[in-house]
Amino acid sequence: MPFSFFSRKKPSRRFNDFYEDWSKTLTENCLPLLRQSLSSAASASVLSSNVDLVLRHLVLYYETLDLAADHNTIPYLLFPSWRNSLETPFLFLGDIHPYLLTNLLRSFIDRENQDSDDEDEETSLDLVNQPLKMTMAWKDPSDELVKRIDQIECTMRLMVPGLMDRMRKTQRSFVARVSESWVSSYQVGKKKKLTATVATASTSVDEAAKIEMEELVSIFVDANRLRKSVIMDIVGATSEHQAALFLEGLCQFLAGFKDQILLQDFEILSLPN
């Protein structure tokens, strides 16, 4: 489809359908697989296989979006209208913030290694009903794991500001280039008929926008690459039981965005008094 900044067929419906199908698979297939894997009856091979399947589902999501990113779709991918108000605060360049991933991992470790006196009776009863490998998965993490988490977080602290800086520069350049092209085209055609003037200006703006759109596509793909690498690095750095627990927590968090009761409560709280 030819690129046009002012008139293009919105692909938001297509992305909405894709996201809904992906989320449904996450909730109805991935979560049950992981929970089955974390039961005492599951074998090591089942655990490993299901972790790989869920990881692939997450990675494939970003790969699909990367393939769909072009001049026409990038405005919708960076600012997805199909995301609800509960999801929006967690978005960074079109999808979940990479910091969320390591924060989730840290929360597992911190919760398990907090002072035992802080544990309530209900929590203790829950632990009794879980397989020993699950209850002890995050207890006293190895120095190697802690070091690897630090390295992942260090990489994010470098990459995230860099992506944000690229985004700001591209936006400034986009506004400057489009404004200049619009004014120049309008001055050239101001003695012509109004329709011809607008058409000439629109064409010039479209051409100017193409250049900046290419950089926006690159930024979006790089942001997805960071998200993918963080997820894969965490799974690679943890044991199979830890990886399964992390992916279960991540899937549960993402599935929670579709909880209609939670969404309704959030929207009520967001309303001005």
Curated annotation (Swiss-Prot):
> Is Cytoplasm one of the keywords?
yes
Its gene is: INP1
Record PROSITE patterns: DOG1 (PS51806)
Q: State where the protein is found.
A: Cytoplasm
What more is known?
The number and position of apertures is strongly correlated with pollen ploidy.
| Distribution of this protein across tissues and organs | Expressed only in anthers and in pollen. Not detected in other flower tissues, stems, leaves and siliques.
* Molecular function as annotated in GO: sequence-specific DNA binding
What is the protein's name according to its record? Answer: Protein INAPERTURATE POLLEN1
- Briefly, what is this protein's role? Required for the formation of pollen surface apertures, which arise by restriction of exine deposition at specific sites. The aperture length depends on the INP1 dosage. Does not play a role in specifying the number or position of apertures. Acts in a sporophytic manner.
Q: What happens when the gene is disrupted?
A: Normal and fertile plants with pollen having normal reticulate exine patterning but completely lacking apertures.
Q: What are the alphabetically sorted keywords of the record?
A: Cytoplasm
Record-annotated membrane-spanning stretches:
none
One GO biological process this protein is involved in is: pollen exine formation
Keyword set includes Cytoplasm: yes
Q: Where is each DOG1 domain found?
A: 12-267
Question: Where does it mainly reside?
Answer: cytoplasm
Q: Provide the Gene Ontology terms for cellular component.
A: cytoplasm
